[in-house]
Amino acid sequence: PIYPFHDIVGTGEDIIQAMIADGYTGRKGKGGFYRLNKEGGKRVKEARSLTTGEYSPADRKATFPSAKMGKQGLGPLMDYPDEGAAFVTEILLDTLSYAAHLVPDVSDDVYSIDSAMKVGYNWKRGPFEMIDSIGASNFVERLKTSGRSVPGFLKTAAGNGGFYSVADGEIQRLTPDGSMVAVERPESTLTV
């Protein structure tokens, strides 16, 4: 199936194919998305504009006040009124809703998806854990306000209070049919 994320991101093939055809293949070529250039005897890191293809010095010190909001959680960060927070919000809305669109086609076990993202990509939290930290209902409202589609499974989570809960000392996960089941972990597994 085709998911909305494909429409947003596309494959990027046209940019990449044009770069390869023009010899921009990385360090051994003319550069890539970034390149090191010498100016006045100093090495300067440059970034390629995805719209013009021109290089300009990469601004390593670009900071936004919202960068300090991350410690307060994703919800407060997404609410912060600056360009950095707006960028993060767009990425989170697209990425996390994409993960919810994949259930149950890829897996019906949100815990397995979260674990795979943490182990495979070194994320601190998986996509469904992030949605729970924002609040599933809050996240659904943000998607609606932005004009994005809301996956059915995400609607189920919003109506259920989230993807995870704790009952009788056991972590429970939401299933596509709306029921909660205990998260199964091997006995030898420890989590902190």
What annotation goes with each model-predicted range?
Residues 1-192:
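N-terminal glycine-rich phosphate-binding loop for ADP-containing cofactors
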